[in-house]
């Protein structure tokens, strides 16, 4: 499995962060490339719950995320899209000024045939890491707004 990740310090506690992260109605404000929700099961955000969403035209296409873990320090989903499949995890540990957060994606490419490794090394991993960083930056803005309102 390949891996891309981003880190930040955010002003909310881990439970507050996971509540915000799993609120699909808020995703347009922070998830990179999110255009619209197509489907959401009643069990979301519990394990087995699923959301299907569509990206902007220049994005990932149709994305399906199924919750695989919702523990005290992490929220993980199995991610399926045209170009890859993998596990996305938001981890949060308490810190003096909120939480230390890591957003990671462990993935396998489903395209590029025998050139997968080269494509990943030269283009894909960096693009994914940059997208995770942008998502985490926008999530930080949402977390700061959430803190201000509480």
Language model segments and positions:
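Beta-strand/loop substructures that line and gate deep hydrophobic ligand-binding cavities in soluble
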Residues: 78-134
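Beta-strand elements of well-folded, non-transmembrane domains
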Residues: 10-12, 57-61, 107-111
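Hydrophobic ligand-binding cavity/cleft-lining segments
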Residues: 1-43, 138, 150
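Generic structural detector for well-ordered beta-strands
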Residues: 7-11, 66, 91, 108
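Short, solvent-exposed helix-to-loop capping segments enriched in aromatics
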Residues: 19-33, 48-59, 127
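Glycine-rich portal/gate segments that line the openings of hydrophobic small-molecule binding cavities
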Residues: 38-87, 96-100, 134-150
């Amino acid at each position: 499995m390949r891996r891309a990740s981003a880190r930040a310090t955010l002003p909310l506690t881990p439970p507050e962060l996971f509540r915000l992260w799993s609120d699909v109605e808020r995703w347009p404000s922070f998830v990179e490339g999110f255009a619209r929700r197509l489907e959401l099961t009643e069990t979301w955000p519990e394990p087995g719950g699923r959301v299907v969403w569509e990206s902007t035209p220049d994005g990932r296409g149709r994305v399906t995320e199924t919750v695989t873990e919702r523990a005290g320090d992490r929220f993980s989903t199995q991610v399926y899209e045209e170009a890859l499949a993998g596990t996305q995890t938001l981890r949060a540990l308490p810190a003096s000024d909120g939480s230390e957060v890591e957003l990671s994606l462990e993935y396998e490419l489903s395209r590029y045939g025998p050139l997968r490794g080269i494509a990943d090394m030269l283009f894909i991993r960096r693009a994914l890491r940059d997208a995770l960083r942008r998502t985490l930056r926008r999530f930080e803005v949402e977390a700061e707004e959430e803190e201000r309102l509480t």
